[in-house]
């Protein structure tokens, strides 16, 4: 099971309290499921930093700054991290992957 979370599930910033709270809750859910299903289901929390998505385009506009895709993670990097977690050898696990 892969939870695509956010860097906000590991760290919080002023002005993003509700968003961070929801991401910390997702981290806790993944941790609880991992403990409950240990040995039967692998649970990975993926915490990408800022990814080049429409959300970042909108945030840039709201903050009055230009959007530059080069400043963000390529979505393909997130996909590669998911694939890495899925293709681990039996018995191996990646409890948390952080991309920045």
Predicted regions and their residues:
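Rossmann-fold scaffold of SDR-type NAD(P)-dependent oxidoreductases
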Residues: 3, 44
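Residue(s) in the substrate-gating loop at a strand-loop-helix junction
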Residues: 6
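Active-site-adjacent segment of SDR/Rossmann-fold oxidoreductases
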Residues: 11, 32-41
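Active-site loop immediately N-terminal to the catalytic Tyr-X3-Lys motif
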Residues: 11-17
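Short beta-loop-alpha junction of Rossmann-like oxidoreductase domains
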Residues: 41, 50-59
């Amino acid at each position: 099971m892969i939870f695509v979370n956010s860097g906000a599930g590991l760290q919080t910033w002023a002005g993003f309290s509700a968003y961070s709270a929801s991401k910390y809750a997702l981290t806790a859910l993944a941790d609880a499921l991992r403990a409950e299903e240990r040995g039967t289901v692998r649970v990975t929390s993926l915490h990408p930093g800022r990814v080049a998505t429409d959300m970042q385009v909108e945030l840039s506009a709201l903050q009055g700054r230009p959007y530059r895709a080069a400043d963000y993670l390529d979505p393909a990097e997130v996909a590669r991290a998911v694939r890495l977690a899925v293709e681990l050898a039996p018995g191996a696990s990646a409890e948390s992957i952080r991309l920045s």
